[in-house]
């Protein structure tokens, strides 16, 4: 059993013009969940990721690891579908439609979209209440940082081959995060596109439709990203934040699980 082995949460964040706390520009972040023997390799990979990012050259970086004491849950990745669109306008229109299909009202979707430009500097995710149409979390610029999830490479590569998806670490990380977030009972849907100027694909994810990639969500060269979790829950928002930050999750795809 996997549980016998001790796992470590490894995290990286990099910024330019000082640390994030000092108002520096966010460059890159990374989250891994690994056994100890992969530590050197993982730390080097995160270092490389932070140093070679298209958002710029960092002058502040932090890499930390800690032992995880909570028991690790293993889950399936969300099913993936790629939607080819010809322009960001078409992509955003489709995203709104998919959010509605997933159970977010049109009114709440529009309220979120009105505020998305203001949230472009939020480093983590914004939690948005589907009842009030207001932001729930009080984390301001920091956002909620989903952590402690990973997808072991060998299994991911097998999945990518089977799913006819390129085996890029970007897809691995995004799908691992979306799969962890989506399994939370209070999360109705996630809307995301990257703050990386070189990457314009985004997605809508949810329990009903899985992970819906959309090939154009913004113009090339723009550094405004988005990550919004639409929440339907009466519990205290801090319990949701705790789950997303602390519950350790490993993705493990099994071929017969996919329809």
From Swiss-Prot:
GO molecular function: 6-carboxyhexanoate-CoA ligase activity; ATP binding; magnesium ion binding
Cofactor: Mg(2+)
Keywords of the record: ATP-binding, Biotin biosynthesis, Ligase, Magnesium, Nucleotide-binding
Domain of life: Bacteria
EC main group: ligase
Keyword hit for Transmembrane helix: no
Pathway assigned to this chain's UniProt record: Metabolic intermediate metabolism; pimeloyl-CoA biosynthesis; pimeloyl-CoA from pimelate: step 1/1
Reaction(s) the record says it catalyses: heptanedioate + ATP + CoA = 6-carboxyhexanoyl-CoA + AMP + diphosphate
InterPro entries to which the protein is assigned, alphabetical: BioW
EC number: 6.2.1.14
Pfam families: BioW (PF03744)
Keyword Transferase attached: no
GO process annotations (BP): biotin biosynthetic process
Function: Catalyzes the transformation of pimelate into pimeloyl-CoA with concomitant hydrolysis of ATP to AMP.
Subunit organization: Homodimer.
Family: Belongs to the BioW family.
Protein name: 6-carboxyhexanoate--CoA ligase
Species the sequence originates in: Bacillus subtilis (strain 168)
Gene giving rise to this polypeptide: bioW
């Amino acid at each position: 059993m996997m549980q016998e082995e001790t796992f470590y949460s490894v995290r990286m964040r990099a910024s330019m013009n000082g640390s994030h706390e000092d108002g520096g520009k966010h460059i890159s972040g990374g989250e891994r969940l690994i056994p100890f023997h992969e530590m050197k390799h993982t730390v080097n990979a995160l270092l490389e990721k932070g140093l070679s990012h298209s958002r710029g050259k960092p002058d502040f970086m932090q890499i930390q690891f800690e032992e995880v004491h909570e028991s690790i849950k293993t889950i399936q990745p969300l099913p993936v579908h790629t939607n080819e669109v010809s322009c960001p306008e078409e992509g955003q229109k489709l995203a709104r439609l998919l959010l509605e299909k997933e159970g977010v009202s049109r009114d709440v979707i529009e309220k979120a979209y009105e505020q998305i430009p203001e949230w472009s500097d939020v480093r983590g995710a914004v939690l948005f209440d589907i009842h009030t149409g207001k932001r729930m979390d009080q984390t301001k610029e920091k956002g909620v940082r989903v952590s402690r999830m990973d997808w072991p490479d060998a299994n991911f590569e097998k999945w990518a081959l089977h799913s006819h998806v390129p085996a890029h670490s970007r897809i691995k990380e995004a799908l691992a995060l979306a799969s962890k977030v989506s399994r939370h009972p209070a999360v109705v849907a996630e809307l995301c596109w990257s703050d990386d100027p070189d990457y314009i694909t985004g997605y809508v994810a949810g329990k009903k439709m899985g992970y819906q990639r959309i090939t154009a969500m913004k113009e090339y060269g723009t550094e405004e990203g988005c990550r919004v979790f639409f929440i339907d829950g009466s519990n205290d928002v801090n319990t949701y934040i705790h789950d997303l930050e602390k519950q350790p999750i490993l993705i493990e795809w099994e071929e017969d699980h996919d329809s």
